[in-house]
């Protein structure tokens, strides 16, 4: 019996991993996918036609870059749900608008017109009842000093050249974003609570927490559905009584 069956996690579940650079999103994605026998969905940056241009000129290409990311993530989300779920997703569609596009706008590297166009498009595409939101978002978090230490340890050249002030700002923006996020259930996991590279068996502890969150979310949906049903039934009863009074008016009093 695998962990998905042991903890009764639906095979159609879609779980997305979020968090700033260096918190271990890819490691978590891989570990959970193997534990649950799910597929993975990773961010594709090699085929992005705007990335190099963007780094040369933020102001000119920030809007194009964000539109490209939105389109690609939307298509990927659609593909995942058309496949029937069963995916662990590295990075969510929500982070681009909630963090990166907003940062460019606030810093002046995306003009107000482009930012408004982008956010309107995002809201029309994603923030609707028709968009297939994930069943759970796992947010990886930890002290900014530990995050910077991880970034330095893995030694990627572009990241090594990035000033520490940027990582501090990004850490703060992520915290502000997740504290106001409500598009799907959230499970917050501290990066110092587990070490999946040294202790891969710890993934079961995370799977157990995922199962609890999914069960709570399912129960909440059922309760909300019942509340809606009873509210709807009361409205229906009131409407029926009103119609009955119109169709069968009370007889006039006789003297």
Regions flagged by a language model, labelled:
Residues 1-13:
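Extreme N-terminal, non-catalytic leader segments
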Residues 17:
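Hydrophobic anchor at the beta1->P-loop junction of P-loop NTPases
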Residues 20:
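P-loop (Walker A) phosphate-binding loop of NTP-binding proteins
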Residues 99-172:
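A glycine- and Lys/Arg-enriched "phosphate-lid" helix/loop adjacent to the NTP-binding pocket
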Residues 148-255:
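NTP-dependent small-molecule kinase module
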């Amino acid at each position: 019996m695998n962990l998905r069956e042991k903890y009764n996690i639906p095979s159609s579940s879609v779980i997305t991993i979020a968090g700033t650079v260096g918190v271990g999103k890819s490691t978590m994605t891989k570990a959970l996918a193997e534990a649950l026998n799910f597929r993975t969905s990773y961010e594709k940056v090699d085929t992005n036609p705007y990335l190099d241009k963007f780094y040369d000129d933020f102001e000119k290409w920030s809007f194009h870059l964000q539109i490209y990311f939105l389109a690609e993530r939307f298509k990927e989300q659609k593909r995942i749900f058309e496949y029937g779920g069963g995916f662990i997703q590295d990075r969510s569609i929500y982070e681009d608008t909630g963090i990166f596009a907003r940062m460019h706008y606030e810093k002046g590297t995306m003009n107000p017109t482009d930012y408004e166009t982008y956010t309107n498009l995002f809201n029309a595409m994603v923030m609707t009842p028709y968009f297939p939101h994930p069943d759970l978002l796992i947010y990886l978090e930890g002290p900014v000093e530990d995050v910077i230490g991880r970034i330095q340890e893995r030694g990627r050249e572009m990241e090594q050249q990035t000033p520490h002030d940027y990582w501090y700002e990004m850490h703060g923006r992520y915290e502000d974003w997740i504290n106001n996020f409500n598009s799907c259930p959230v499970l917050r996991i501290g990066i110092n609570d587990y070490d999946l590279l040294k202790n891969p068996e710890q993934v079961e502890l995370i799977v157990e927490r995922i199962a609890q969150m999914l069960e709570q979310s399912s129960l909440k949906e059922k309760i909300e559905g019942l509340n809606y049903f009873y509210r709807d039934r009361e409205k229906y009863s009131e409407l029926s009584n009103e119609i009955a009074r119109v169709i069968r008016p009370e007889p006039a009093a006789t003297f």
